[in-house]
Curated annotation (Swiss-Prot):
GO biological process: L-methionine salvage from methylthioadenosine
Function: Bifunctional enzyme that catalyzes the enolization of 2,3-diketo-5-methylthiopentyl-1-phosphate (DK-MTP-1-P) into the intermediate 2-hydroxy-3-keto-5-methylthiopentenyl-1-phosphate (HK-MTPenyl-1-P), which is then dephosphorylated to form the acireductone 1,2-dihydroxy-3-keto-5-methylthiopentene (DHK-MTPene).
Name of this protein: Enolase-phosphatase E1
Enzyme Commission number(s) from the entry: 3.1.3.77
Length: 225
């Protein structure tokens, strides 16, 4: 295939969706009110609060209202950058306190070593912040995997369901589309990446998963490069 880099989605691809939905999201919702109260004067958190007010079109929203908005966004799985930034900060505390370990599928852990031996570059692209991705892979149940990655992309690169995000990745890593393989479980993301010219594979890890016309795999062990 002439592949020189692999870009992977996280939730549902490298990481069990249940870990995200049943552990990380509820933890961020539980901790959020106290976290905002304690850190509202932190510059990064303060900027996120302002961004929430802007996105919600509520410039005068007080901290209680901002908290309410963010909790609603968590419930809706909203891919808003300020939410993802705050969640990343909350999860950092959780990992540091030993509340949980990042779940990574064993087949991806094994594949990472093979990619490095082949001289392939590996990137992750998630709606979760870059910091949250580093925490996930740096505090995984298999140890620290961060040195096996060449970089990470998040919503600042673009919406994963739009072609432009993948064009932005191409510009950043300076490779042609056909030199990149994108692996995700989400059809809309695969469609957008395909429109940008990337090679794509759909990861199917659940029996009830939506599938389309893209080539499917159920494990990274099935990828032949």
């Amino acid at each position: 295939m002439g592949i020189r880099a692999i870009v992977v989605d996280t939730a549902g691809t490298t990481t069990d969706l249940n870990f995200i939905e049943d552990i990380l999201f509820p933890y961020s919702a539980k901790v959020l009110p106290a976290f905002l109260e304690e850190n509202q004067k932190n510059v990064l958190v303060e900027n996120c609060i302002c961004d929430v007010q802007d996105i919600a079109l509520e410039p005068d929203a007080d901290l209680a209202r901002v908290t309410e908005i963010l909790l609603q966004w968590i419930e809706e799985d909203r891919k808003a950058t300020p939410l993802k930034t705050i969640q990343g900060l909350i999860w950092k505390q959780g990992y540091a306190n030993g509340e949980f370990k990042g779940h990574i599928f064993p087949d991806f852990i094994e594949a990472l070593d093979g990619y490095k031996q082949q001289g392939l570059r590996v990137y992750s692209f998630s709606s979760g912040s870059v910091d949250a991705q580093k925490l996930l892979f740096g505090n995984s149940d298999a140890g620290d995997l961060t040195d096996k990655f060449n970089g990470h992309f998040d919503t600042r690169t673009g919406n994963k369901r739009f072609k432009q995000a993948y064009c932005n990745i191409l510009n950043t890593i300076s490779l042609s589309p056909k030199q990149i393989l994108f692996v995700s479980d989400v059809l809309e993301e695969l469609k957008a990446a395909s429109e940008a010219g990337l090679n794509v594979l759909q990861m199917v890890r659940q029996d009830n998963q939506r599938t389309g016309d893209f080539k499917q795999i159920s494990s990274f062990a099935e990828i032949e490069l």
